[in-house]
């Protein structure tokens, strides 16, 4: 198990810069990639690669790869396993603040609200067309690139809809969860994301 407050993992081809944050099953760090030289966000799973949650992490990588070419979805650059056996994702780095932090300072103006909403709605539509239900759309998961373009991030609890759907649904963010998830409904569908959006 990786101690997210301990030293960062050693990842070949990358230099550690700082810890960005930690969640339930992963920690996100800022690294500098050696080739090509750029700053990237590296999401490292806290559990070892043999742990059963490793498949959840692999699923997130594969789901993001299916849709990350959309301009309003966080780009994934690669994935691997660190020297100490922890799976990781290499992603586009979006400097703070994310939408949740911005909204705590006050509301966006009408033009910013419409622009952000339209772009994120396009990202959600793209995910749905690929058969992916995000399941965790909330202000904290809407980041802004260096050029102030909003991007949807964190596909960690996403699920497939339609024939590829899994019976196992994990987690939710209660304030943005649709009513059917709050009453224990086990299926994921696009309407859930629309409600959260």
Give residue ranges: language-model regions.
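AlphaC helix of the eukaryotic protein kinase fold
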Residues: 46-67
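Protein kinase glycine-rich loop
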Residues: 17-23, 28
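Conserved N-lobe loop of protein kinases adjacent to the ATP-binding glycine-rich P-loop
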Residues: 32-39
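Conserved short submotifs of the Hanks-type protein kinase catalytic core
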Residues: 84-98, 102
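Protein kinase catalytic-loop region centered on the HRD/HxD motif
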Residues: 122-132
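Short beta-strand micro-motifs within the conserved protein kinase catalytic domain, predominantly
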Residues: 75-87
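Activation segment signature within eukaryotic-like protein kinase domains
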Residues: 116-117
């Amino acid at each position: 198990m990786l101690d997210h407050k301990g030293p960062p993992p050693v990842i070949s081809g990358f230099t550690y810069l700082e810890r960005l944050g930690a969640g339930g099953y992963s920690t996100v760090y800022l690294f500098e990639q050696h080739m090509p030289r750029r700053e990237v966000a590296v999401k490292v799973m806290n559990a070892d690669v043999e742990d059963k949650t490793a498949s959840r992490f692999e699923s997130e990588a594969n789901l993001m790869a299916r849709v990350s070419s959309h301009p309003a979805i966080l780009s994934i650059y690669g994935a691997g396993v660190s020297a100490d056996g922890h799976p990781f994702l290499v992603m586009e780095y979006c400097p703070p603040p994310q939408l949740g932090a911005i909204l705590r300072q006050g509301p966006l103006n009408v033009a910013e609200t419409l622009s952000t909403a339209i772009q994120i709605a396009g990202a959600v539509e793209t995910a749905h067309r690929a058969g992916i239900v995000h399941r965790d759309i909330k202000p904290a998961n809407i980041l802004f690139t260096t050029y102030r373009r909003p991007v949807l991030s964190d596909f960690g609890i996403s699920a497939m809809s339609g024939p590829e759907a899994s019976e196992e649904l994990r987690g939710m963010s209660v304030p943005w969860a649709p009513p059917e998830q709050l009453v224990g409904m086990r299926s994921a569908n696009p309407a859930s994301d629309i409600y959260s959006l």
